[in-house]
């Protein structure tokens, strides 16, 4: 991902304020509510029958935290996202058979959640930088797909 020095600073400054546990669970939960077909990858998570059930599901929260932990790692390797996410790409492609479009959807949901949490601090410039990052991460995660 090519970011200007200003964009990198905007991304890392805001990310330093993110509660990964909270935002991760909320982002994954919103993905599952807004795009219900994505729930098929989470059969083992128990009750996903209503928006409240999804948003309060401890397994959704735990996996969201894990997902955002990987995203955090990616932020420290913006110049090598494909390498950083190679193993996760392989896992999601070969073993889990996740539609790579879902990575793009989750990235966009994450941007919405950040906007919700940070309000005026999440300026159009910050959003533009984050859109570049989530697009780069989605592309890296889709890299192993044939």
From Swiss-Prot:
The modification Phosphoserine is found at residue 44. Residues 2-146 form the Globin domain. It comes from Cebus capucinus (White-faced sapajou). One of its GO terms (cellular component) is haptoglobin-hemoglobin complex. The modification N6-acetyllysine is found at residues 59, 82, 144. Heterotetramer of two alpha chains and two beta chains. Involved in oxygen transport from the lung to the various peripheral tissues. InterPro entries: Globin, Globin-like_sf, Globin/Proto, Hemoglobin_b, Hemoglobin_oxygen_transport. Keywords: Acetylation, Heme, Iron, Metal-binding, Oxygen transport, Phosphoprotein, S-nitrosylation, Transport. One of its GO terms (molecular function) is hemoglobin alpha binding. Belongs to the globin family. Red blood cells. It comes from the Eukaryota. Signal peptide: none annotated. Heme b binds at residues 63, 92. The modification S-nitrosocysteine is found at residue 93. This is Hemoglobin subunit beta. PANTHER family: HEMOGLOBIN FAMILY MEMBER (PTHR11442), HEMOGLOBIN SUBUNIT BETA (PTHR11442:SF42). One of its GO terms (biological process) is hydrogen peroxide catabolic process. The modification N-acetylvaline is found at residue 1. PROSITE patterns: GLOBIN. The modification Phosphothreonine is found at residue 12.
């Amino acid at each position: 991902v090519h970011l200007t020095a200003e964009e990198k600073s905007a991304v890392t400054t805001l990310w330093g304020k993110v509660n990964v546990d909270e935002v991760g669970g909320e982002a994954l939960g919103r993905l599952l509510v807004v795009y219900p077909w994505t729930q098929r990858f989470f059969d083992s998570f128990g009750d996903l029958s209503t928006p409240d059930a999804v948003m309060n599901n401890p397994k959704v929260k735990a996996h969201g935290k894990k997902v955002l932990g990987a995203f955090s790692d990616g932020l420290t390797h913006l110049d090598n996202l494909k390498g950083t996410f190679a193993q996760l790409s392989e896992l999601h492609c070969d073993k889990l058979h996740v539609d790579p479009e879902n990575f793009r959807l989750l990235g966009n949901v994450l941007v919405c959640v950040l906007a919700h949490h940070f309000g005026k601090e999440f300026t159009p410039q910050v959003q533009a930088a984050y859109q570049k990052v989530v697009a780069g991460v989605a592309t890296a995660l889709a890299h192993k797909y044939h």
